[in-house]
Amino acid sequence: QVLAFSPSDKTIRVQAGIRWRAIQRFIDPHGLSVKVMQTYANFTVGGSLSVNCHGRYLGLGPVVQSVRSIKLVLADGQVFDASREHNAELFFAAIGGYGAVGVIAEAELDLADNHLVQRLNRKMGVGDYLAHFRDQIRNDKQAVFHNADLYPPHFTRPQIVSLAEVD
């Protein structure tokens, strides 16, 4: 569940069992969006943080870049608050640590402004993809998400999906 929310600071503190979809539903009326999450919204925040998942956001990298702090429960029952500045070694060991350090119980996340996007689909030969990405996607200021997927048996024709901001 949501523990704290500040639309003006663009932050939210949640229990680790909440799904990304529930967060987005909660913040959407405030014109906000999750800053970084994996492609699908049905995963839990705790699970996503424990593997330091990534999405298809251009220029943002893995989910750790949007995490302000976590509450971590160690195997012996000790509870620690951790962030980049406080207990940083626990923060960076837990995010992407697959539960080896402890269980992430809560997380404070950065949010972003919510923008309307348009989905663009393309198929092309795999040999043309690098030039397409370099020339059409990488420096496009409107491009928000992008990925190219290969599906059997068409391993030479990626399905390209881009989402771009619209006015």
Describe the residue ranges of each PLM region.
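Glycine-rich N-terminal segment of FAD-binding domains in flavoprotein oxidoreductases
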Residues: 1-42, 51-57
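A structural signal for short, hydrophobic beta-strand segments that form beta-sheets
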Residues: 2-3, 64-67, 104
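Gly/Ser/Thr-rich beta-alpha loop segments that engage phosphate groups in nucleotides
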Residues: 19, 48-49, 57, 63, ...
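Flexible loop/turn segments at secondary-structure boundaries
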Residues: 20-22, 43-45, 111, 154-157
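Short loop/turn motifs at secondary-structure junctions and domain boundaries
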Residues: 33, 61-65
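Short, glycine/charge-rich beta-strand/loop segments that flank catalytic centers
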Residues: 36-49, 68, 150-152
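Catalytic micro-motifs at enzyme active sites that drive phosphoryl/nucleotidyl and oxygen chemistry
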Residues: 56-60, 90-93
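C-terminal substrate-binding/cap subdomain adjacent to the FAD-binding core in PCMH-type
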Residues: 68-167
